[in-house]
Each structure stands twice: as C-alpha cells, then as structure tokens.
Amino acid sequence: MNSAAPHGSSNWDPVGLGLVPMVVEQSGRGERAYDIYSRLLKERVIFLVGPVNDVTANLIVAQLLFLESENPDKDVYFYINSPGGSVSSGMAIYDTMQFIKPSVSTLCIGQAASMGSFLLAAGEKGKRFCLPNSRVMIHQPLGGFQGQASDIEIHAREILGIRAKLNEMLAKHTGQPIEQIEKDTDRDRFMSAADAVEYGIVDKVLTNRADS
C-alpha cells in the first residue's frame, strides 16, 4: 500500500485498445450492444483489476452507488485481482462499501495484495471468497517523502498513524488479535487460498459455481 506515491493510472487500457469483448442482446426493440463489463454491471458484478488508484477508485465508488440506487436490498459482487496501491484511494472504496445498504460480496481471482487484500477482507462476513489458486498478501503501508527534516517527520508520523488504523480495521474484519496483525504486516505475508480462510480474510474457497 503506497500512502505517498502519485495516484497514476496503469498504461494498460483494454478499452482504448479495443480489446474488450462486446455482447449483443436481442429485445423487442431490436439489438443493443454492451461492452462485457457494462453487461456484467447489469448483473451487479463489478471489478477491481490492477492497481488501486484514484481512477479505479472513482469508477468503483460510482458503480457501488449506482447499484445501491438500482436496488438497495440486492447484493453486489466485487471481483478483485489487484497488487494494491494508494491507501487514500482504497479507503474511498472501503468507506463506500461500508456506507451503502447492499451487502458487498468479495471474491479474489488471481491475487489480492496490499490494499487489494484489505478490500477483500472488507466484504460482508460470510460472503468473502477466493478461487483455489488465488494468492493473498498483507503488509504495512509504504511511503516515501523528500524534503526538510521537519516535513519528513510529519509524514513519518502520518504513515505510522495510517498503519495503526489499517491494522485495527484488519483485526476487526479478520478476527485476529491486533498484536498478530501488527506482527504479520511488519513484512510481506503471503497466503494461499486456504491460508486466507484460516486467517479470516475470506470465508470460503470456491472451486466451482455450486460452492457459492
């Protein structure tokens, strides 16, 4: 989790490259084409793929709020495949997940590292999943700052405060003692899908659709 780095977006832009599949649906009014992500949004499925930054956070927050307005009583399905990223951007997603009325079910595909694992754990208890070969990693927030000594000290205190807050929140969502969280996030802690269940980050490993 990078608390101080610029919130840039990835160079990978499948929409701009024209690589996103289109789905054509027939209706009494004729044909309508959707990109695959818009079509899945109709099924209340949203994605975090790639780094957590201001761009991805803005899109995810908007989708969460839209789905709440569509149906406040129906679950949202949040698929995560992310190496992590900005703490402030991740907190925007986290706070919105907790704020909206629908339950948010999280599912890790591929990896959920750093802020990605934090958001995975923040799903509705009993509705947090990962696929068998996914990987999860937790660690403390990263920060880098240059400037006068007094400014560096201010930023160091801020990062320590963020770390303590994130540890408290992760302890709440996983059920782990805060002392264990502090120890495990001191360095990169990698977990298999089964390890993530045991740790309390997710509730179940799904091997097929029937398991969900």
Swiss-Prot record:
A GO term (biological process) for this protein?
protein quality control for misfolded or incompletely synthesized proteins
Gene3D superfamilies assigned = 2-enoyl-CoA Hydratase, Chain A, domain 1
Top-rank taxon of the source lineage equals Bacteria
Under Pfam families, the record lists: CLP_protease
What is an example of a GO molecular function annotated in this UniProt entry? ATP-dependent peptidase activity
Catalytic reaction list: Hydrolysis of proteins to small peptides in the presence of ATP and magnesium. alpha-casein is the usual test substrate. In the absence of ATP, only oligopeptides shorter than five residues are hydrolyzed (such as succinyl-Leu-Tyr-|-NHMec, and Leu-Tyr-Leu-|-Tyr-Trp, in which cleavage of the -Tyr-|-Leu- and -Tyr-|-Trp bonds also occurs)
EC identifiers of the protein: 3.4.21.92
Compartments annotated for it: namely: Cytoplasm
Any keyword Cytoplasm?
Answer: yes
The UniProt entry annotates the active site at 114 (nucleophile), 139
Residues folding into a coiled coil are: none
Q: Which UniProt keywords apply?
A: Cytoplasm, Hydrolase, Protease, Serine protease
A GO CC term? cytoplasm
Q: Sorted alphabetically, which HAMAP family does this protein's record hold?
A: ClpP
Which family does the UniProt entry place this protein in?
Belongs to the peptidase S14 family.
- Cross-referenced NCBIfam families, in alphabetical order? clpP (TIGR00493), PRK00277.1 (NF001368), PRK12553.1 (NF009205)
Q: What does this protein do?
A: Cleaves peptides in various proteins in a process that requires ATP hydrolysis. Has a chymotrypsin-like activity. Plays a major role in the degradation of misfolded proteins.
Assembly, per entry? Fourteen ClpP subunits assemble into 2 heptameric rings which stack back to back to give a disk-like structure with a central cavity, resembling the structure of eukaryotic proteasomes.
Name assigned to this protein: ATP-dependent Clp protease proteolytic subunit
The organism is: Aromatoleum aromaticum (strain DSM 19018 / LMG 30748 / EbN1)
Q: Source gene?
A: clpP
